Structures are given as C-alpha cells and as structure tokens.
Swiss-Prot record:
Protein name per its UniProtKB record: Glycogen synthase
UniProt: ADP-alpha-D-glucose binding residues: K15
Key words of the record: Glycogen biosynthesis, Glycosyltransferase, Transferase
Gene it is expressed from: glgA
Matching Pfam families: Glyco_transf_5, Glycos_transf_1
Keyword Transferase: yes
Pathway info: Glycan biosynthesis; glycogen biosynthesis
Gene Ontology molecular function, alphabetical: alpha-1,4-glucan glucosyltransferase (ADP-glucose donor) activity; alpha-1,4-glucan glucosyltransferase (UDP-glucose donor) activity
Gene Ontology terms: cellular component: cytosol
Function: Synthesizes alpha-1,4-glucan chains using ADP-glucose.
NCBIfam families: glgA (TIGR02095), PRK00654.1-2 (NF001899)
Length: 476
C-alpha cells in the first residue's frame, strides 16, 4: 500500500512539538510493516540542510507562484520537499517570526502544502502515486479539501494532534486558494465567517483520527470541542472518527541503549538509575539526597499543561521532602514564577528555561516522578517516556494520559497493573493528594520498584499504531 504523509515537521530535523515525533517514527514503523511510505513537507531551511541530496521531480506553476518539487531520502523514508524559497526559506520557526507574530502569508504557505500533496495523488510524480494520503493537523488540512475538489483521486485520513490549533484565516483569501466557492459554507471549511484549515480536514477527509481513544471521545463535548463538537459528533455517527494512541520511538527512548545518559539501565538494573539521579541533582544544583524523590516537569510552560497547579502544590511537595526539576519555556508569567521558586528554594528546586532534547533524556532518567497535570492532553508523550524509564508518571485523567497510566490504587497494586498516579479534578488540591500518595508509595521501596518494573515493561511502541493505521487505510 502506497501512503503519503502530509505535515510540516520531522524529528529530529525540525521540531516545535509532538507532531514532529510522530512523523519521525510512524512512517518508519509502517515501512517495517510492509507499506510503501513517503512524506511531503515544505522545504524549510532545517529540512533542506538535513536532506541535502535531492533530485528534481517537477517544476510547476501554482497559485503561489513557480514551485519545484524535490525528492530525497531520510533514514530510509522517501521525502518530497516543496521548494518555494519566497514562502519557506525563513530562519527560525516555521510558523512565526522572531517577534512571535504568525506570518501573514501562512494561509498561502500551508495551502500550497495541501495542494502539492493533492497533485501527487493526481500523478505529479510519474514514478509514484499514493493510494492513501494521510494529513496531519491544520497545516495539512486543506489537503483533504483539494482531494475532494479533484474527485478524490486517493483516499484520505486526517489526524488531529491538537484541536485547539484551528488554522483560521480571513475568508478574503478564498479566491487565492483555487478551491470551489461552494466549499465555503457550514458544510465545508467555513467557521464563524473565517476559513478553518482544521475544519477542512475534519469535514472533507474520508476518515478522521485523533492521537488517543479518550481524546476522540472528549472532543465531541463542548468543553474540549472548540466549537467543532457538532461536526465531530456527526463523524462519530458516521463511523468516521477513531482514536489511535501515539507510540514511543524505542530507537531514541530506551534507557538500555540511550547514549545521552550518564549511565544506561533497564528494569533488572535499577541501581544504575540512581547514578543518573545523582548526576541530575548535581547538574541542577540540588542537594545530593538519594532518599528525596525528584519530581520533574519537561513541558511547554503553559496553563494548558496545568503547570500553575504545580506552583500551587509546590510548598506541599517540598514540605513532604521532595525536590522539583523543571525544563521548558512558554508563558512568561509561569517562567518567572518557576525561576522565583528556584531562587527561594535553592538546593530543592532547579529550573532551566528553554528546551534541550539531550537534557530532557537526562531529566527523565534521573527523576523519580514525571508530572503531567494537563487540563487537556490529546495524547502526551512525556508520560510514555516516564514509563519507559521507570520514572512514574503523575497525571490528570484526561486524553491520552487516561489511556496510558494506571493509578496506584490498592486494587491496581494488588493485581500488578499500577503504573503511576492519576487524579481527576483540575485543581491544586487534587494534585496535592496525588503527590501525597506518591510519597506513601515512595516510603515502601519494594512496592515502588515493583511498579517501576511493570511500567518499564509496558509496550507503547509505534508498531502497534502502525498496524492500526494500516488496518484503517485498508477499510477506506
């Protein structure tokens, strides 16, 4: 089966969020299952540098000007790059300028991505033509609309990685996009008077997926639907909405083989994990104390991630004898609050603003608990990394967090299914209660190690998701 993924990021070459991790792993897993998989992306500078050897497929005139389609390979996967320097050759983020303002021509930049993907489905590359086009998030949403406008030359799947980002643009741009005027309506890509690239994907795709089963249910409710819940409820009735859990790339995230760690370890050698803890305490200026559990945050610092709750719960966490490590950037108010906490609690709280992939590995390996108290979480990867590394996740019961972490309640400890700590209400006191339960288990090292070993043996590999997606493609 020939599959084309349409997206804007690819780990490790270009990453702003979890989408890049998915595209860096899912196509390779599908290839291993026998599929013929390729990816199409804009030729952003980081991607051009990472894939320097390409051949010209075609040069064509488009509504966005003269464009070259180039083809190369990265880690065994065929990659199409859309070479349009005026649109894509910009330093920094693929989405906004240095002042964090979204590029004013994003509507054109990402419409071209969808249009070129559709052209491939129509035979632009005389040597390869996809049977299934799989578009990811709003950046690729117009792909499904272009395919519908061209009579659906390939089947289409649209994956929502985060419904909060809707790709909204002025309706004045519609005439530039080479889409039928009748597509701009409530049964189409119109959303409260604007064009929504996300809605285009939801409405025109043959099938829609989200990145966890629980998130697929949540987004049909007003609290999580961002105004799209009516359309999503219709997709459920039509049997066109499925939740497929993201996975972990074990080539990158495995404590047995992770070369970024001071010391590698596995479920049978947890003593070596303690060496990583000592290194982390030293690196973050924390008191060297093996008996103090380290709670870690590796995240964008936003209210969506529930990190205001962590700040509220911090006095209790420290009073109980814990330490806190934070790696991330985002909301200026949260950044300043965490830095102030580190200054006030020197030796017990360590904060590094920014994101460093290598250091994130060392934090997850060296910590005892990974905090993911999100208000909503489509899937979440951090808790999966925690499980893999024996760093027990403490999460709120939402989205993919609910699908992947089993609470250390007595009955789950008894039957051996417990893998972390789960709380329900989105409030600081609920988080505090979960932290207290973590300390209770911490006080019983034998039970803690038992849960650690179980967590590390859980299989959240990409092969499971790859099989599920290929099965879905065949049903279309």
């Amino acid at each position: 089966m020939r599959v084309l993924h349409v997206c804007s990021e690819l780990f490790p070459l270009l990453k702003t969020g979890g989408l890049a991790d998915v595209i860096g792993a899912l196509p390779a897993a599908q290839l291993a299952e026998g599929a013929d998989v390729r990816i199409i992306l804009p030729a952003f500078p980081d991607l051009r540098r990472g894939i320097p050897e390409t051949v010209l497929v075609r040069e064509i005139d488009t509504f966005a000007g003269r464009v070259a389609l180039r083809y190369g390979h990265y880690r065994g996967i065929g990659i199409y790059l859309i070479d349009a320097p005026a649109l894509y050759d910009r330093a920094g983020s693929p989405y906004h300028d240095a002042s964090l303002y979204a590029y004013s021509d994003n509507y054109l930049r990402f419409a071209l991505l969808g249009w070129m993907a559709c052209e491939l489905a129509c035979g632009l590359d005389g040597y390869w033509r996809p049977e299934v086009v799989h578009a990811h998030d709003w950046h690729a949403g117009l792909t499904c609309a272009y395919l519908a406008a061209r009579g659906r030359p390939a089947r289409s799947v649209f994956t929502v990685h985060n419904l909060a980002y809707q790709g909204l643009f002025s309706a004045d741009h519609l005439s530039e996009l080479h889409l039928p005027a009748e597509f701009f309506q409530i049964y189409g890509l119109e959303f409260y008077g604007q064009i929504s690239y996300l809605k285009a994907g939801l409405f025109f795709a043959d099938h829609v997926t989200t990145v966890s089963p629980t998130y697929a249910k949540e987004i049909t409710q007003p609290a999580f639907g961002y105004g799209m819940e009516g359309l999503l409820q219709a997709l459920v009735r039509q049997g066109r909405l499925t939740g497929i859990l993201n996975g972990v790339d074990s080539d990158i995230w495995d404590p047995q083989s992770d070369t970024l760690l001071p010391t590698r370890y596995d479920a049978e050698n947890l003593q070596a994990k303690a060496i990583n803890k000592t290194h982390l305490q030293t690196a973050m200026g924390l008191q060297l104390a093996e008996n103090k559990p380290i709670f870690a945050v590796v995240s964008r610092l936003t209210v969506q991630k529930g990190l205001d709750l962590v700040l509220e719960a911090l006095p209790e966490l420290l009073a109980l004898g814990g330490q806190l490590v934070v790696l991330g950037s985002g909301d200026a108010t949260l950044q300043e609050a965490f830095l102030a906490a580190a200054a006030e609690h020197s030796g017990q709280v360590g904060v590094q603003i920014g994101y460093h992939e290598a250091f994130s590995h060392r934090i997850i390996a060296g910590s005892d608990v990974i905090l993911v108290p999100s208000r909503f979480e489509p899937c979440g990867l951090t808790q999966l990394y925690g499980l893999k590394y024996g760093t027990l996740p403490l999460v709120r019961h939402t989205g993919g967090l609910a699908d992947t972490v089993v609470d250390c309640a007595l009955e789950n400890l008894a039957d051996g299914s417990a893998s972390g700590f789960v709380f329900n209400e989105c409030e600081a006191q609920a988080l505090v209660k979960a932290i207290r339960r973590a300390f209770v288990l911490w006080s019983r090292p034998k039970h803690w190690r038992h849960v650690q070993r179980h967590a590390m043996r859980l299989d959240f590999g990409w092969q499971l998701a790859a099989v599920d997606y290929l099965s879905l493609y065949r049903r279309l």
